[in-house]
Structure formats: structure tokens, C-alpha cells
Amino acid sequence: MSASPSPSITGLLLAGGRATRMDGADKGLQLLDGTPLALHVLRRLSPQVDETLISANRNADRYAELGAPFDARIVADETADFPGPLAGLLAGMRAARAPLVACAPCDTPYLPADVVARLHAALDAQQADIAMAVTVDAQHARSPQPTFALLRTSLADDLAAALAAGERKVRAWYARHKTVEVEFRDERAFYNANSWHELAALARR
């Protein structure tokens, strides 16, 4: 999708976490095949949306540099204590110029090229508040992927209230709203790097 004065979907790259299992390193800036993970994701996410935001609480200048080719804007959490992806979602929903926000984590370099379209189709068909990706493996086991989701920005005030009340679990907040699950069979597309070991494994895939 191309940028427009009234975008319909805002893309949100979630890059604001602590990365405790990577010794606090900024995950989105770690290299895979010589390229920062965040840039891999931006290259896949941005063509699917009308505008792009990057949720980043550290290294804002570096993320702005990575996001420049996509006209991405940087947004930070409203609180400084790294409360988790819900806070990044809220920042993105507040900053979005579109009525829908499609989020993806910064450490998933293989995300599907049609993830936003499929989430949007399901959201629209079910008149849902949230559409969330779920992977299904060869044994039919389902694995929710809550940070791959499409959400209505009209939920921002409710999310702010939930955060103020101490909610930190993404799926728990989703459960308060009409959420549709969208199945994806390609597990590889959702592989991520929560640790140095997983980053090394990504490089071998």
C-alpha cells in the first residue's frame, strides 16, 4: 500500500522491549545476514500498510535512520519502566493516523508478505475488534502469535485503562474484546529471536 493523506492501516514495528534474554541488547539492532533485524521486518511490513511507526524506547536515532526509507515515525512508551508490548501498542494506537494498526515484533525477519491482508479480511468478515495470527503445525498444534495482530485504534482508551490497572499480558487484554484468530501454516514465517541462541538459529534457517 502507498502512503496517503487518510491511511486505512498503520503498521507498527514493536521494538521497545528490554530483551532480558539477550543481556539487554536492543534486539531490533542485532544483525542477521549483515542487516539489522528491524530492517528485515520493515522491508516486509511497510509494503503492506499505508504508514509505518516504530515503537522504540532506546536508540531512537538509529531506528529513525532505519525507518527513513519507509517514512517511519518513532513513538515511545508513555511510561519509562518498559511495561511490555501493550505499552508499545498503546503508543502506536495513539500516534496512528489510520483506524487500524497492524503490529509485528522487531525480531521476526520472515513475517508473511500477506499477513496484514489476511488479518484485515478476517477482522472485516467477523466485525471483530482484533485479529490475531495463530500458527498451526503439522500435528495441528496451535500457537497464538499475539504480537502479530490487527487492532482498531478506537480501543486505545480501554488499553490505557487496562495498563493503568496493571495489565501486562497481551492475550489477557485481547480476551476482553472480540478477537478473531487467523491460522497460518508456515511456522517459519513467525520465527523470532528472543535469545542469542535463537538469533544464531535464525541465521541457519
Swiss-Prot record:
* Keyword terms of this UniProt record: Cytoplasm, GTP-binding, Magnesium, Metal-binding, Molybdenum cofactor biosynthesis, Nucleotide-binding, Transferase
Q: Which residues bind Mg(2+)?
A: 107
Question: What would be an example GO MF term here?
Answer: molybdenum cofactor guanylyltransferase activity
| Catalytic EC class | transferase
Tell me the superkingdom of the source: Bacteria
A single BP term in Gene Ontology:
bis(molybdopterin guanine dinucleotide)molybdenum biosynthetic process
Please list the residues that bind GTP.
14-16, 27, 77, 107
Query: Which Gene3D superfamilies does the record associate with it?
Result: Spore Coat Polysaccharide Biosynthesis Protein SpsA, Chain A
Q: Which GO terms describe its cellular component?
A: cytoplasm
Cofactor(s) needed for function = Mg(2+)
Q: Which reaction does it catalyse?
A: Mo-molybdopterin + GTP + H(+) = Mo-molybdopterin guanine dinucleotide + diphosphate
Any one Pfam family match given in the protein's UniProt record, by short name: NTP_transf_3
Q: CDD domains given for it?
A: MobA
Fill in the domain comment.
Answer: The N-terminal domain determines nucleotide recognition and specific binding, while the C-terminal domain determines the specific binding to the target protein.
Record note on quaternary structure: Monomer.
Task: Tell me its family.
Answer: Belongs to the MobA family.
- Protein name from the UniProt record: Molybdenum cofactor guanylyltransferase
Q: Which organism is it from?
A: Burkholderia ambifaria (strain ATCC BAA-244 / DSM 16087 / CCUG 44356 / LMG 19182 / AMMD)
